[in-house]
Design a protein with these regions (language model features):
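Core beta-strand-centered patch of the WYL/Sm-like small regulatory domain
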Residues: 1-113
Length: 113
């Protein structure tokens, strides 16, 4: 389902239930990437929009997939990658399985999964 949200043009928001921190609950996010983190755990990298958070307000967050359940692809879409997005995973993600591509100048966003 998350791959479907990322592959859509435009991409869709998702909502899921997360139990990987001290504030379990539903999160709504803009999914950007699925990859392995430094501990080789499969993670969703997403722009956090709403829900409980132990790591502050809106911004990029990583969610370990073993703690993600009840995923729903929402009808609401988003324009594409947020500022600061690193399609190569940056220093904390590797073995990318699915991700948004940064659009080329004067072209629409491309998606790759």
């Amino acid at each position: 389902m998350i791959h479907q949200a990322i592959n859509s043009n435009p991409p869709h928001l998702i909502q899921f239930y997360y139990t990987g921190d001290s504030q379990p609950g539903y999160r709504t996010v803009e999914p950007h990437m699925i990859a392995l983190n430094l501990n080789d755990a499969l993670c969703l990298s997403a722009w956090f929009l709403s829900g409980p958070s132990t790591s502050g307000p809106q911004g990029f967050k990583e969610y370990e997939m073993e703690f993600v359940s009840e995923v729903t692809v929402l009808e609401e879409t988003f324009a594409g990658p947020r500022p600061g997005y690193q399609p190569d995973g940056g220093k904390i993600l590797h073995s990318i399985q699915c991700h948004l591509l940064v659009p080329a100048p004067s072209r629409r966003s491309k998606l790759d999964c």
